[in-house]
């Protein structure tokens, strides 16, 4: 840490899901408003919700969002260690944006602690060299006081001590037990760590803040740590970071013009692709787990998958595959993204075992598009800018993040000027089956609106206006609303002390 840099800030949480990611994003946007250059950083993240930076490096989507909040383009130095769970007690390990191996849970800290700490220090050095006057805004992971893991901690208090960061402890009051969470966390800190905690933040409080005044006084009297703020319930501003948290989301809209079903398969990844649809007031998303009925939605989306063959097997075993075939044959529209597109094809082959299955295998797909996919070679990681051809001619941007090569039958219509990036086929009653490798396709406002208007036409509804903005504009508005609430409800002065 250079002497010219302002003191780093760190957002810790009493548990997973406490709201660390959003509070870190809020801090980044508030500092940007005050003329500071915030530098978001999470040493190690575990997530299958990923982003690809301009140099082809892979990082967690939550750090990309924090970069946008800070007015920066995301770069993988902001998240130098990314673990991508594969569902079998193993994770793909990403260091500096590139895949470096597969780790088993029981051996991770034995085999990967030293390389991970080296990658974290390298990421910090790269950020500080590029922005020497910037202020690091760090996000912790889970709880900082998991006693069995403290000796090998990579991203919480080890990092806070290393950088002498001023720490804010966030606790989620919505889930109950907030006093025990806070007191328990503070009591488990080691003496050298306790002075790093400069304040407590109560998150997701419902009702008038005055109702928590007695709780604030009790916490300050019994812990000696000031409560710097009480943030109101803002959970619907952004979708959750963890796919498990999708199970807790309840529909917030009443009657809408359209309903789109999204298959929440066991190895769901990159569900941030659905954020633009979450923001569309004219529709609602209904997440479907294996075993639940498909119903009669206006469209079905198969998102990305970390384990495509296993998710396809899950669909077959619970009858969801047969339901989807019948739905498409009856005139239902289907959109598959990345692994979802691969499942829509005729066959999937994994001769090198890249999918992590017990044996190299081939498997029949859903047969809704004439595609043959082979998992081989290296992972494709790149940002893309291309010309869309269907359902309208419009510029498209996004990124590729996948293993595998997909070959279409001759005559299948390409989705864009890159004939290997996606395809579409017409179905009965004006429906369509669409598949693409382009993550972020729905972020493109004109494309999204044209696709939704085709669904509306199937329903006999009037089209929506053809002047939609890209989702980045809506996301920026939400970040401003988040920062507005943070500035209103949180006293930052103790946290910003040198």
UniProtKB/Swiss-Prot annotation:
Active-site residues (renumbered): 338 (nucleophile), 439
Ranges annotated as spanning the membrane: none
All copies of domain GATase cobBQ-type, residue ranges: 257-447
Gene3D superfamilies named among the record's database cross-references: 3.40.50.880, P-loop containing nucleotide triphosphate hydrolases (3.40.50.300)
InterPro entries linked to this entry: Class_I_gatase-like, CobQ/CobB/MinD/ParA_Nub-bd_dom, CobQ_GATase1, CobQ_synth, GATase_3, P-loop_NTPase
Molecular function terms from GO: ABC-type vitamin B12 transporter activity; catalytic activity
Keywords: Cobalamin biosynthesis, Glutamine amidotransferase
CDD domains assigned to the protein according to its UniProt record, in alphabetical order: GATase1_CobQ
Signal sequence segment: none
Regions annotated as coiled coil: none
Pathway assignment: Cofactor biosynthesis; adenosylcobalamin biosynthesis
GO biological process annotation, one example: cobalamin biosynthetic process
Domain of life: Bacteria
Annotated function: Catalyzes amidations at positions B, D, E, and G on adenosylcobyrinic A,C-diamide. NH(2) groups are provided by glutamine, and one molecule of ATP is hydrogenolyzed for each amidation.
Family: Belongs to the CobB/CobQ family. CobQ subfamily.
PANTHER family given in the database record: COBYRIC ACID SYNTHASE, DETHIOBIOTIN SYNTHETASE
Protein name: Cobyric acid synthase
Organism: Synechococcus sp. (strain CC9605)
The organism's taxonomic lineage, starting at the top: Bacteria, Bacillati, Cyanobacteriota, Cyanophyceae, Synechococcales
């Amino acid at each position: 840490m250079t002497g010219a840099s302002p003191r780093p800030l760190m957002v810790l949480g009493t548990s997973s899901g406490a709201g660390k990611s959003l509070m870190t994003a809020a801090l980044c946007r508030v500092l940007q408003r005050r003329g500071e250059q915030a530098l978001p950083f999470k040493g190690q993240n575990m997530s299958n919700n990923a982003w690809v930076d301009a140099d082809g490096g892979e990082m967690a989507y939550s750090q990309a969002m924090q970069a946008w909040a800070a007015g920066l383009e995301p770069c993988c130095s902001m998240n130098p260690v990314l673990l991508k769970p594969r569902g079998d007690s193993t994770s793909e390990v990403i260091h500096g944006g590139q895949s470096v191996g597969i780790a088993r849970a029981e051996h991770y800290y034995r085999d990967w602690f030293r390389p991970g700490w080296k990658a974290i220090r390298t990421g910090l050095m790269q950020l500080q060299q590029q922005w020497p006057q910037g202020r690091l805004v760090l996000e912790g992971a889970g709880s900082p006081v998991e006693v069995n893991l403290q000796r090998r901690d990579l991203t919480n208090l080890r990092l806070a001590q290393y950088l002498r960061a001023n720490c804010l402890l966030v606790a989620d009051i919505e889930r109950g037990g907030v006093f025990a969470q806070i007191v328990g966390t503070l009591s488990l800190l080691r003496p050298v760590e306790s002075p790093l905690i400069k304040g407590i933040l109560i998150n997701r409080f419902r009702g008038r803040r005055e109702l928590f005044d007695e709780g604030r006084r009790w916490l300050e009297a019994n812990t000696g740590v000031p409560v710097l703020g009480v943030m109101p319930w803002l959970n619907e501003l952004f979708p959750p970071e963890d796919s498990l948290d999708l199970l807790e989301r309840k529909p917030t809209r009443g009657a809408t013009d359209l309903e789109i079903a999204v298959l929440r398969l066991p190895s769901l990844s990159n569900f941030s692709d659905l954020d633009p649809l979450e923001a569309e007031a004219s529709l609602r998303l209904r997440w479907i787990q294996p075993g639940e009925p498909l119903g009669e939605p206006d469209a079905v989306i198969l998102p990305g998958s970390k384990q495509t063959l296993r998710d396809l097997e899950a669909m077959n075993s619970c009858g969801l595959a047969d339901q989807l075939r019948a739905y498409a044959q009856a005139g239902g529209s289907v959109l598959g993204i990345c692994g979802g597109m691969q499942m829509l094809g005729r066959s999937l082959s994994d001769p090198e075992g890249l999918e992590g299955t017990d044996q190299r295998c081939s498997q029949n797909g859903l047969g809704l598009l004439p595609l043959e996919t082979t998992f081989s070679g290296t992972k494709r990681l790149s940002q893309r800018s291309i010309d869309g051809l269907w359902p309208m001619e419009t510029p498209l941007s996004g990124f590729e993040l996948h293993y595998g090569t997909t070959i279409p039958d001759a005559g299948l219509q390409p989705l864009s000027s890159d004939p290997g990036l996606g395809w579409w086929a017409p179905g009965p009653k004006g429906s369509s089956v669409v598949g693409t490798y382009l993550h972020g396709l729905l972020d493109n406002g004109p494309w999204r609106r044209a696709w939704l208007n085709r669904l509306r036409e199937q329903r006999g509804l009037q089209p929506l206006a053809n002047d939609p903005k890209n989702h980045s504009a809506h996301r920026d508005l939400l970040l401003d609303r988040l920062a507005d609430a943070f500035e209103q409800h949180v006293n930052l002065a103790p946290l910003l002390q040198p």
